[in-house]
């Protein structure tokens, strides 16, 4: 029987990417979709396959939600916190698929990334688990790149430095970044065409503008354009940011590892728009040749691609501009460190709105539709 699927939060960045991917893969032909809204119930919904979806449902109407076989939400944590307990307390037996972090670490929830943990997902389904949550964006992208090493139990620990896109913070932050860029350009646009101006004169104007009271800072609170922000999410008692804490906590839950893999690092916001990049220092638990490491990585899933460690291939393939709006997971700069042959460095890039957010949700929906 074709399943009824309630879709909530489809207007945001993750939700919009999800709808786009579902149309590309003809997923709507397999379900009966119902579009919900927290603010515009009764109005027109999205256009799917050139057909306008009419009469949006009220996303706070528990009775309507309970009629769904599956609910997939990209509405955010506050919505999940308000609605999910009410549904479960009313004995709703449907499947809940969620992009928000609220339920990730709950015992009765499974973090989904099926190219990496399909066995964990299937075991959860066999046990009657009905709550499935997308992972943290950097964690999911790391596992898509390093999955072969993880599933073959070759890693002792990982230290990661992230270079995270503005979109990871939300659409308002992307807009603010672009406004910051525009503001800086506007103050020097004429100077850039005047050869009498030195670079230092231009730099001074840019710096002064970024420090001015009129500079757009409502969301980031500090400049990101021409700068970076070495802190993401709230502060933990041990000195980590919560974003850094998620690396170890979520990875071990996703893989359901018996022996915990230690993961730590520093998470940094940069002025990329969609793609997160990550630099890894990996301690292997045995000495494996670099060629075997490459084979293990590339054989893990169809999306990961090992980029040869040379300048030209790296510049062409291992950047946010090359990867944005694709499902590609390039990994490069692979080399053994001079510290010891069991130490490996690597660098990877991935679109945080695709494998980092929407794609695992879409694929989980398809797993449930085919049950």
Swiss-Prot record:
Task performed by this protein: Catalyzes the NADPH-dependent formation of L-aspartate-semialdehyde (L-ASA) by the reductive dephosphorylation of L-aspartyl-4-phosphate.
Superkingdom is Bacteria
Catalytic residues (positions): 137, 276
Catalysed reaction(s) here are: L-aspartate 4-semialdehyde + phosphate + NADP(+) = 4-phospho-L-aspartate + NADPH + H(+)
Q: Which residues bind substrate?
A: 164, 243, 269
Q: Does the keyword Amino-acid biosynthesis apply?
A: yes
Give the pathway annotation. Answer: Amino-acid biosynthesis; L-lysine biosynthesis via DAP pathway; (S)-tetrahydrodipicolinate from L-aspartate: step 2/4; Amino-acid biosynthesis; L-methionine biosynthesis via de novo pathway; L-homoserine from L-aspartate: step 2/3; Amino-acid biosynthesis; L-threonine biosynthesis; L-threonine from L-aspartate: step 2/5
Q: Which family does it belong to?
A: Belongs to the aspartate-semialdehyde dehydrogenase family.
What is the recorded name of this protein? Aspartate-semialdehyde dehydrogenase
Summarize the subunit comment: Homodimer.
Chain sites annotated for binding NADP(+): 11-14, 38-39, 75, 167-168, 352
């Amino acid at each position: 029987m074709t399943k009824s699927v309630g879709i909530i939060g489809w207007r945001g960045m993750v939700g919009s990417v999800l709808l786009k991917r579902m149309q590309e893969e003809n997923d709507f032909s397999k379900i009966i979709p119902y579009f919900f809204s927290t603010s515009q119930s009764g109005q027109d919904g999205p256009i799917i396959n050139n057909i306008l979806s009419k009469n949006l449902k009220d996303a706070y109407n528990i009775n309507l939600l309970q009629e769904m076989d599956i609910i997939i939400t990209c509405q955010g944590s506050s919505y999940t916190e308000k609605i999910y307990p009410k549904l479960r307390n009313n004995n709703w037996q449907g499947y809940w698929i969620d992009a928000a972090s609220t339920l990730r670490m709950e015992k009765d929830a499974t973090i989904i990334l099926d190219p990496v943990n399909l066995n964990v997902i299937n075991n959860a389904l066999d046990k009657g688990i009905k709550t499935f949550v997308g992972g943290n964006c950097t964690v999911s992208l790391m596992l898509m790149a390093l999955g072969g090493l993880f599933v073959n139990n070759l890693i002792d620990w990982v230290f990661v430095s992230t270079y995270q896109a503005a979109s990871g913070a939300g659409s308002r932050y992307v807009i603010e970044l672009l406004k910051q860029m525009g503001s800086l350009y506007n103050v020097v646009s004429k100077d850039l065409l005047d050869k009498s101006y030195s670079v230092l004169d231009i730099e001074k104007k840019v710096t002064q503008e970024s420090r001015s009271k009129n500079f757009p800072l409502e969301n980031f609170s500090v400049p990101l354009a021409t700068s970076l922000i070495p802190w993401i999410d709230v502060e933990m008692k041990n000195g980590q940011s919560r974003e850094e804490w998620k690396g170890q906590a979520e990875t071990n839950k996703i893989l359901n590892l018996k022996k915990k893999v230690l993961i730590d690092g520093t998470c940094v916001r940069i002025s990329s728009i969609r793609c997160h990049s990550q630099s890894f220092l990996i301690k292997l638990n045995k000495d494996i040749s670099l060629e075997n490491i490459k084979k293990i990585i590339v054989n893990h899933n169809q999306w990961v691609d090992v980029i040869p460690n040379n300048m030209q291939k790296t510049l062409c393939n291992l950047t946010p501009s090359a990867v944005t709006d694709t499902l590609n997971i390039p990994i490069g700069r692979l080399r053994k460190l001079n510290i010891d042959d069991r130490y490996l460095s690597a660098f990877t890039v991935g679109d945080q709105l695709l494998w980092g957010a929407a794609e695992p949700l879409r694929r989980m929906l398809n797993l449930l539709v085919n049950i």
